[in-house]
Amino acid sequence: MTTDLTLALDAMGGDHGPHVTVPAALQALKFHSQLKIILVGDKTEIERHLQHSAGIFLSRIQIIHTTEVVNMCDRPVLALRTKKNSSMRLALELVRDGKAQACVSAGNTGALMAMAKVLLKTLPGVDRPALVSSLPSMTGRPVYLLDLGANVSCDSEALFQFAVMGSVLYEVVHKTSRPKVALLNVGVEEVKGNDQVQQAAQLLHHTEQVNYTGFVEGDEIYTGNVDVIVCDGFVGNITLKTSEGIAKLLVSELKRGLNQGLFVRFLSKLIAPRIHAVLSKMNPDHYNGASLIGLRGIVVKSHGNADEAAYLQAVNLAVTEAKRRLPEMIKDRLESILLDINS
């Protein structure tokens, strides 16, 4: 990193608040020498977690005090109307006003999307932002899944826009031309799926600038046969949470199995580095951080129950996206694609 970069963190968001967000912020400052962080939240709580560990990083930390918090049970519209001094909203306003290049929050997903859409506005040609995150695959290449919960129900046009944005994002981040895009469906046959998925497929079939390959089923998500998988937020969120639960089960069973019997324990020590690598790849925390794409600013959503290491992943993602100026790059590519589609 060659120039200063400022992130705004919703320090009160998520299940653990400053107990997680503040230590993760300090770790990020350690890794990124030009990074500055604005912590938005209750100053007393934030300073309590900074007291014994901030040290040389204090000059790169700013606190904006507020005691108002968006709760996980708050309705998005109500939070938008009534919680105008919340830590989430103030963090987003810093991005809107150009005082920060990105915002990270582990708070209420619906409220975050509603506030971000109102404050940051969507890019030209985008009706709804979408949450997207990378997942591991059998090929070693990441797979992008969207939407992950920002839009519980979607029409065909929204799914089409998600496909375009996901394709552009993959190109920008991974410098890959024409990534393979698919719609998540209950079958691969062309006649399968509800009206929204069917109509989105027709739109994508007639779009040359998107490398649409057809439908994929749930068991193909992690094969790496496609790069971008599109679905509505209801399906995407359940898919993601189910996958995380299965990953945790597999890790737990593997650890339990390796502790049974003297010979197995001895063997496991010999191959410990390889086991650690496998477990790390399967750990959902390693992939924490979903990007709210389609906005004029950068917003990264962390899991609400993220621990320090997982939240740090979300902060690192925000740093990467800010360094690469993703909104500007997506805007340019998106305008080109939509212009070609509409011409």
UniProtKB/Swiss-Prot annotation:
Main location (coarse class): cytoplasm
Top-rank taxon, per record: Bacteria
Designated name of the protein: Phosphate acyltransferase
Gene label: plsX
Family: Belongs to the PlsX family.
Function statement: Catalyzes the reversible formation of acyl-phosphate (acyl-PO(4)) from acyl-[acyl-carrier-protein] (acyl-ACP). This enzyme utilizes acyl-ACP as fatty acyl donor, but not acyl-CoA.
Assigned keywords, A-Z: Cytoplasm, Lipid biosynthesis, Lipid metabolism, Phospholipid biosynthesis, Phospholipid metabolism, Transferase
InterPro entries, alphabetized: FA_synthesis (IPR003664), Phospholipid_synth_PlsX-like (IPR012281)
